[in-house]
């Protein structure tokens, strides 16, 4: 993290996290001012390469170019998500904005990993993007285990019923809450907000962005390009200890139309 982001993040935490890791009122004026400070500070930072994320990667566990149906042939769509492949990208949306949808990577990843993907907004009017990770059944079953309840994109099926996971909303621009001022990390089941940081992908941005998600033991971070928006250590006070190995999924709400490419996941070295 660069100096400007470090200082701004410190201000944000001081104002909003004195006793808990949650904002009591993220939409008040001081919070909005702090978010602006953090966004400005992030823009001053020097660009970072993957080696600059203060973590050592080991093996490349999985990669998909996401540029053809063959490149995602083992992925599983839940809900009415529609895919289109063009110009080296995978577009994902719900026809007629029918319903939310979740797209599961087929691999189960270890507790400690770094994942990266690129994405670009194709519909600036509205949308919401989430990443689920460390996802399993409540008894650590594979999320695709046939004994688990069927899922079709309804949110409660992922955060309140039969699964445990973390999820981060890193682009949030819904009709009821346009240009939401924070990114959120929740620990499930229970939709427990455990951390709120500065906004993720700018709602007015139509350029491509690189998302980097790092889970190093109990430490969870998420970057949009070189900008740190989530930085939290799971102390086990919510839903028990840190979650372990599990699957990753990309979720979009019904209004969302993004395109994706170059999804990669690395393991981390033991000396992180």
Go through each PLM region and give its residues.
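Bacterial N-terminal signal peptides that target proteins for export
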Residues: 22-35
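Bacterial N-terminal signal peptides
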Residues: 34-43
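Extracellular carbohydrate-recognition regions
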Residues: 49-77
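Short tryptophan-centered beta-strand motifs in secreted/extracellular beta-sheet-rich domains
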Residues: 66, 115-117, 207-216, 220-222
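Short carbohydrate-recognition loop motifs
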Residues: 82-99
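Secretory/extracellular carbohydrate-interaction modules
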Residues: 96-183
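Short, aromatic/His-centered strand-loop micro-motif at the edge of beta-sheets
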Residues: 186-210
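Flexible glycan-contacting loops in extracellular carbohydrate-active proteins
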Residues: 233-261
């Amino acid at each position: 993290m660069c100096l400007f982001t470090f200082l701004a993040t410190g201000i944000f935490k001081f104002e909003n996290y004195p006793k808990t890791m949650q904002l009591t009122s993220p939409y008040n004026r001081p919070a909005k001012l702090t978010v602006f400070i953090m966004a400005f500070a992030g823009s001053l930072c020097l660009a970072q390469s993957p080696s600059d994320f203060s973590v050592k990667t080991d093996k490349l566990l999985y990669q998909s170019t996401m540029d053809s149906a063959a490149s995602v042939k083992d992925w599983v769509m839940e809900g009415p998500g529609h895919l289109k492949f063009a110009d080296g990208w995978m577009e994902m949306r719900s026809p007629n904005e029918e319903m939310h949808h979740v797209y599961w990577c087929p691999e189960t990843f270890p507790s400690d990993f770094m994942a990266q993907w690129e994405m670009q907004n194709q519909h600036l009017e509205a949308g919401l993007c989430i990443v689920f990770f460390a996802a399993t059944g409540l008894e650590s079953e594979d999320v695709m285990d046939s004994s688990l309840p069927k899922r079709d994109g309804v949110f409660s099926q992922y955060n309140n019923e039969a699964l445990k996971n973390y999820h981060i909303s890193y682009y949030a621009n819904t009709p009821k809450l346009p240009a939401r001022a924070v990114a959120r990390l929740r620990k499930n089941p229970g939709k427990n907000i455990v951390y709120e940081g500065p906004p993720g992908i700018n709602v007015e941005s139509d350029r491509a962005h690189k998302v980097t998600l790092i889970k190093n033991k109990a430490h969870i971070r998420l970057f949009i390009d070189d900008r740190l928006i989530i930085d939290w250590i799971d102390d086990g006070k919510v839903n028990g200890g840190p979650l372990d190995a599990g699957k990753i999924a990309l979720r979009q709400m019904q209004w969302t139309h993004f395109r994706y490419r170059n999804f990669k996941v690395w393991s981390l070295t033991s000396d992180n």
